Every structure is written in C-alpha cells, then in structure tokens.
Amino acid sequence: MNLGCIEIHPWNSRVNDYDHCNKMDLIETEECGLNYPDFIVFDLDPYINIDNKNESKEPAYSLAAFRTTVEIALGLEDIFDELNIKSYVKTSGKTGLHIFLPVINMYTYKQTREFARVISQILNKRNPGQITTEWKTTDRKGKVFLDYNQNSIGKTLASVFSTRPVEDATVSVPLKWEELVDIIPTDFTINTVPDLYMRKIDPWKDILSHKQNLEEILERVSDFEV
C-alpha cells in the first residue's frame, strides 16, 4: 500500500520457510521452493477489437468478445473434465478470464509450463482458427489469446478480488464454471463486489485442498484423444 499499488499480483509459488529463506543469498535456492508453483495457470484474453497500428494496445472491452472468450474457456473446462482435473475460473478484472489448476508444489515452472503448452495445443486443435498463442499483439487480432507462458518464475496475474486500475474500478472475481454464461465482468466493481460476496459462498474457498498430482494427470493425457 505504501507504494500506491492498486492491483495485487502474487506469484504462483511461495517460500517454504520465510524466516529461513528471507535472505538474498537463499531466496532463489531450490530448498526455498520458489521454483515450485502451487498452480498451473491459463490466461485468456479476447483480441477481437484491436488496432494494428498500435502493437502495445490492449484489447478494448466488449461483451461479444468476452462471450467468445467464455466459449473457449468452457472448451478448456471440457478438457479438464475429461482428464478428471479440478479447475477454478475467475474474471481477470478487465477483458478476459484466468483459470487455475492447483497442483502439488513438487514440479518446476518448466514442467508446469510444458503441461500448459500441451493442454493449449489440444484446445487449439479443437478450436482451429479461434485461438492464438502469438506473442506479437497485432498477430492476435480476431482471436482469443491463450497465454500459457504465465507459468514462468516471476510471472504474475491479478489476484482474486484484486481491483484493476480502470475507470470503473472493476474487480477480478472467483466464479463457478456454470456462472460464466450469465455474467458481465463490468458488473463486478469495488462498489458491488463486497455486498455480492457477503451473500454467497466463495467458489475458490477450497482451492488449496485440491492440489493435484501432475504425474497422474500426465498418464491420462498420454492416452487422451483430441
């Protein structure tokens, strides 16, 4: 707060023993655990309305573009269901969606990123021409950007219930998968969210109780039919 930050962007990994690891020469060592994430993440953003002349411009919000992103996200949920993977979804607080898979923190970022890449390939084959993983913004036009590279040490996403620095002060909110088809992300603001979530059960409340074994999942992926 003393830095004037509006957004909260936590890492997907944590130190095992803060008192021991809170030293610059130890913090990045294997024993401290920062290279072993608790989550595999997928970042979905609709690049339906962008200007080719501005490579750095983020996509403008539109409900139609968001609905397209929801369709892709539900396709991703189908894959997770078929593979018996527990997954959690939230709005990004801006134009897209974030999907989290809780995993046992014994796998490196390199391993979790490779897993996310394989899942992204499966999703792309099921939705030809609708998804892109291109890094150059202008190459994403008209498609939903699926970013699996967020599974890298030091990469961050806005946290659950983080406010975003936009005009309406929208908030990244946790959802049930079945809620996706009805929600409008701009409805979730710093004015509406507190009362709304006082009256409902947090759909992410048990996320840390469902850490999954990636090796068991990979066995199912190897036999998976696209």
Label the model's feature ranges.
Residues N2-I40, P46-F66, V70, G75, ...:
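C-terminal accessory nucleic-acid interaction domains of nucleic acid-metabolism proteins
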Residues E77-K90:
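Active-site palm subdomain of RNA-directed nucleic acid polymerases
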Residues S87-G93, E134-T138:
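Short beta-strand
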Residues S92-L101:
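Short, conserved phosphate-binding/catalytic loop or strand-edge motifs used
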Residues F100-T112:
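Catalytic palm subdomain of template-directed nucleic-acid polymerases
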